């Protein structure tokens, strides 16, 4: 019997809320030391190798990136990332919310540069399982909805129960589409649906939108998406991929609607790593660059 099967027996219906049983990482994190085993460094793609070289010259425990109001619709600010979370990114294991926030800011930046004006983004560091019950979260969502009222899709990378999912929020259609690489029950994300439904009527009232029988958001599962197989913790990378399906080229099961499966290939996963690493090198860690705090 596998560890996953034992987990399902022990926790029954609540097994979805538990971290996945995974093999231990052989190369452990130590601040200031390599993020991957030394023999793997020459095999890293160019941009990941450049970012790794920059990391080795740093003395602190974390690094920061700035963001603009038009990125996350919460004013200008900064996101801070522990180097241990950068290590997890290099090791292709569970990604911290701070890494997902960097990816979100990168996607927002790309949309502005490429003239993609119908997609907006919410802040994963503001809306997650530990904040959904805060009045400040409702206020943030309400103001963000007003700021993005003309967007076709508002994307949120949401983290709960050790897992990331992507929410595509449509204000005009009163609809939320959920892309979950593990196809978990929608009830697990009900808290974030509830807080979105609290902000939605405030937005409609402010906009003076009156439509008969228009109540809460309708929530649907995305049908034809790549799925995460057992044995890895790549859910964050799947959310990165799903965002790419909105903002750029990607391989999706939607290309063949007869498919309801297919997983993220290792080459595609490395390409996601390389893209974020390249953006960090060009726009964050370089002094004086657009998202640098130096």
Regions found by a protein language model. Give the residues of each.
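Enzymes acting in ubiquitin/UBL processing and closely related pathways
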Residues: 1-294
